[in-house]
């Protein structure tokens, strides 16, 4: 049974939208970034949710575009002494925890995540202390401090398999922070899961009414859904999965049209995988909204070309990720458990 804990609702201070660059400015910063990457012995590690021009640059410079799990793997294996992480702050922290000898730079340290912000360590630690009989499993979208409080870290790509494993051992689970992903995992496994009440501000906004209207316009389209979405959206899906799993589903499904319910940043790599198919954004906004779909993380959008160039050029406190040594030691154990478990699934 999944029991829901309801912390005080958080209000997130969204960042301002980056100032658009003209074509000449974009080219200037692209060339500058390429030069700085070579000078700093650096490589770009970009998430699927960053803007297309950022993902393209990562490709052109031998970097990585992936989900959170593969980002974690890539950074540990690459020979570069500096990682430029284009994503949100927890991704940079994870890179530093796993590769402490490397310099970890980000375009901005102000790139937050609503799941991270919605799971403050003091409240979460008290929640865990109130349920000492439960194994603590936290999503990768959390701070280093929350990871250090956990027994396991997990990404959406292996969440179901891990909870199945723990359930087979008779363990009861605390799951944090995403309530929708926690509910999905519980329903898939039947495990005893006690959920924290966090949510992703992007996926939480997908609406069944608007999606039903879109399905009527495109009746032959398949619906691909990330499990951070509400249960009502997941129940409508033809395929449910992590970012990497949705790209695989796009390739295997026979449908020529695909409605995609996740951050629209994924369209860059998904369209590469299925150039012959039409990709449609799942609607998030209600009547009167100014966008057809608002499905793009405002913090991911902070990873612009100018900010990346500044991060590589300036470094320092405004761009370099630091993790307290004690926190790093505490967070490393559950992260390594995740990587070891993921390796057994691939074996």
From Swiss-Prot:
CC cofactor note: Binds 1 [4Fe-4S] cluster per subunit.
Chief site of localization: cytoplasm
GO CC aspect terms: cytosol
Any one Gene Ontology molecular-function term assigned to this protein's record: metal ion binding
Binding of [4Fe-4S] cluster, residues: 113, 200, 297
Pathway annotation from the record: Cofactor biosynthesis; NAD(+) biosynthesis; quinolinate from iminoaspartate: step 1/1
Induction conditions: Repressed by NadR and partially controlled by cAMP.
EC annotation from Swiss-Prot or TrEMBL: 2.5.1.72
Binding sites annotated in the UniProt record for iminosuccinate: 47, 68, 139-141, 156, 226-228, 243
Keyword ATP-binding: no
Cofactor: [4Fe-4S] cluster
Superkingdom of source: Bacteria
Subcellular location: Cytoplasm
Pfam families to which the protein is assigned, alphabetical: NadA
GO biological process, one term: 'de novo' NAD biosynthetic process from L-aspartate
NCBIfam families named among the record's database cross-references: nadA (TIGR00550), PRK09375.1-1 (NF006877), PRK09375.1-2 (NF006878)
Its biological purpose: Catalyzes the condensation of iminoaspartate with dihydroxyacetone phosphate to form quinolinate.
PANTHER family, sorted: QUINOLINATE SYNTHASE, CHLOROPLASTIC (PTHR30573:SF0), QUINOLINATE SYNTHETASE A (PTHR30573)
Name under which the protein is recorded: Quinolinate synthase
Taxonomic lineage: Bacteria, Pseudomonadati, Pseudomonadota, Gammaproteobacteria, Enterobacterales
Name of the coding gene: nadA
């Amino acid at each position: 049974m999944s029991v829901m804990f309801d912390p005080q609702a958080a209000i997130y201070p969204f960042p301002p939208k980056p100032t658009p660059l003209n074509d000449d400015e974009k080219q200037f910063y692209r060339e500058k970034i390429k030069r700085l990457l070579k000078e700093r012995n650096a490589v770009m590690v970009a998430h699927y949710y960053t803007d297309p021009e950022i993902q393209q640059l990562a490709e052109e410079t031998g970097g990585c575009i992936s989900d959170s799990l593969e980002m974690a793997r890539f950074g540990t294996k690459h020979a570069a002494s500096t990682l430029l992480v284009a994503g949100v702050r927890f991704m940079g922290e994870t890179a530093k925890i796993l590769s402490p000898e490397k310099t970890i730079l980000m375009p901005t340290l102000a790139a937050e995540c609503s799941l991270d912000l919605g799971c403050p360590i003091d409240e979460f630690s008290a929640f865990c202390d109130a349920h000492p009989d439960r194994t603590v499993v936290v999503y990768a979208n959390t701070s280093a401090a929350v990871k250090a409080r956990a027994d396991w870290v997990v990404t959406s790509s292996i969440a179901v398999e891990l909870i199945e494993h723990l359930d087979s051992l008779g363990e009861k689970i605390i799951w944090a922070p995403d309530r929708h992903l926690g509910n999905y995992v519980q329903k898939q496994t039947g495990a005893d899961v006690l959920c924290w009440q966090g949510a992703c501000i992007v996926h939480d906004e997908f609406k069944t009414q608007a999606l039903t209207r879109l399905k009527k316009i495109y009746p032959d389209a398949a619906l691909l859904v990330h499990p951070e979405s509400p249960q009502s959206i997941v129940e409508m899906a033809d395929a449910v999965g992590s970012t990497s799993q949705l790209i695989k589903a796009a390739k295997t499904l026979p449908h020529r049209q695909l409605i995609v319910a996740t951050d629209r940043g994924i369209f860059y790599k998904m369209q590469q995988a299925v150039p012959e198919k039409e990709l449609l954004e799942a609607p998030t906004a209600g009547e009167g909204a100014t966008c057809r779909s608002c499905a793009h993380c405002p913090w991911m959008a902070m990873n612009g070309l100018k900010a990346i160039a500044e991060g590589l050029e300036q470094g320092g406190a405004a761009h370099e990720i630091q993790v307290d040594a004690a926190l790093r030691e505490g967070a490393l154990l559950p992260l390594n458990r995740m990587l070891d478990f993921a390796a057994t699934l691939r074996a």
